[in-house]
Amino acid sequence: MYVENSYLSKQLCFLFYVSSKEIIKKYTNYLKEYDLTYTGYIVLMAIENDEKLNIKKLGERVFLDSGTLTPLLKKLEKKDYVVRTREEKDERNLQISLTEQGKAIKSPLAEISVKVFNEFNISEREASDIINNLRNFVSKNFDYSDRK
């Protein structure tokens, strides 16, 4: 039970933790239909339909390292959502792109955000304010390319 005046209720990290955990739980309920994890979902949504990008660029977009992305991309490839191809100029460089099935699934996956939003007791304006504030917070405080 959430206690508004508790020590934790005043801690930014705790509020982010609870929000993230509960939002991901809601997404997970919808993603089961597609046999996707939340991480798989964000990876698919991060790749534009006709785009090829390498693991490093994809990792920067979703704040994941290659050690996490590689096994996930293998699973997504087995499900025929993505294809991994070696770059001709540099065989060490893997290019990731969506398959036709991966492109087709993006529209129903995008609808999940609307379904999840409708489960929350906030207005569109409040949601927009939260998104803008979090975008600002992330851009000012986190740069994935700085990670080693």
Swiss-Prot record:
SMART domains for this protein: HTH_MARR
Pfam families: Staph_reg_Sar_Rot
Top-level taxon of the source organism: Bacteria
Disulfide bonds: none
GO molecular function terms attached to this record: DNA binding; DNA-binding transcription factor activity
DNA-binding region, residues: 55-78
Main location: cytoplasm
Location(s) in or outside the cell: Cytoplasm
Keywords: Activator, Cytoplasm, DNA-binding, Transcription, Transcription regulation, Virulence
GO CC aspect terms: cytoplasm
The keyword NADP belongs to this UniProt entry's keyword annotation: no
Induction description: Transcriptionally activated by CvfA.
Family of this protein: Belongs to the SarZ family.
PANTHER family from the UniProt entry: TRANSCRIPTIONAL REGULATOR, MARR, TRANSCRIPTIONAL REPRESSOR OF EMRAB OPERON
Protein name: HTH-type transcriptional regulator SarZ
